[in-house]
Every structure is written in structure tokens, then in C-alpha cells.
Amino acid sequence: MARIAGVNIPNHKHTEIGLTAIYGVGRSRARKICEATGVPFDKKVKDLTDADLEKLRDEVGKVTVEGDLRRETTMNIKRLMDLGCYRGMRHRKGLPLRGQRTRTNARTRKGPRKAGVALKK
């Protein structure tokens, strides 16, 4: 099993699909990496030579992926929360950021329903 950027790439998949196992590499970026290195994107990972894998490692190393990308994303969200801007407040409250309605729906962001308080008669 090939290892690129600290991630095991599945052997039985094509190179383009296998590279998407790396956090921060999608289909389009995987194809660009394959084109830049000259590795055929429809070749299986198990059929790649050590030289091909080394080229892929070098090319993936030029892109922000895995832990660095996660850290950068987390820091961006933290920065918004520290600024106290609208998006930061919505992150802090766990509500949708981009203007979606919240009177109904938004369950993914808000979490499971909480029992309402019953009024005393």
C-alpha cells in the first residue's frame, strides 16, 4: 500500500481516485497532480513504480493537505470567533452561517431537537 502525505493510498483504485484519500485533495486537484507529474491517472496505484510514487509525493508536498489544512481551517474559524463578527457569532452558537432559515430546519447544524418547556396552567 502506497503512503503519500502520511496517508495509505488504496492499491486497487486508480491513481486519481486513490489520491482523494488525502484530506484536501479532490478529484480535480488529483487530476492536476497526475498531469503535472506525468503519471497516468487511470493507472492502478499498485502498478505505480517507486519513481512515480516519489513524483506524486513531491507534487502533493507542494499543496497544503492533511494536518496543516485542518489546522489552517480551524484557525480561520477561531479568528472569526475572536473578531466577534456575524459569522464568528454563528459559529460560536452552532447555527448556519450563510442566511439559511432557522425557524424550521437547520437540524444538522443545531443538533437533535430539545424538549420544549411546557407552560403551567
Curated annotation (Swiss-Prot):
Keywords: Ribonucleoprotein, Ribosomal protein, RNA-binding, rRNA-binding, tRNA-binding
Matches recorded under InterPro entries: Rbsml_uS13_C, Ribosomal_uS13, Ribosomal_uS13-like_H2TH, Ribosomal_uS13_bac-type, Ribosomal_uS13_CS
Annotated Gene Ontology cellular component terms: cytosol; small ribosomal subunit
Subunit structure and binding partners: Part of the 30S ribosomal subunit. Forms a loose heterodimer with protein S19. Forms two bridges to the 50S subunit in the 70S ribosome.
Record organism: Cupriavidus pinatubonensis (strain JMP 134 / LMG 1197)
Superkingdom of origin: Bacteria
Pfam families (UniProt xref): Ribosomal_S13
GO MF annotation: an example: tRNA binding
SUPFAM superfamilies given in the database record: S13-like H2TH domain (SSF46946)
Descriptive protein name: Small ribosomal subunit protein uS13
Region (Disordered) location: 91-121
Function of the protein: Located at the top of the head of the 30S subunit, it contacts several helices of the 16S rRNA. In the 70S ribosome it contacts the 23S rRNA (bridge B1a) and protein L5 of the 50S subunit (bridge B1b), connecting the 2 subunits; these bridges are implicated in subunit movement. Contacts the tRNAs in the A and P-sites.
GO biological process, one term: translation
Family: Belongs to the universal ribosomal protein uS13 family.
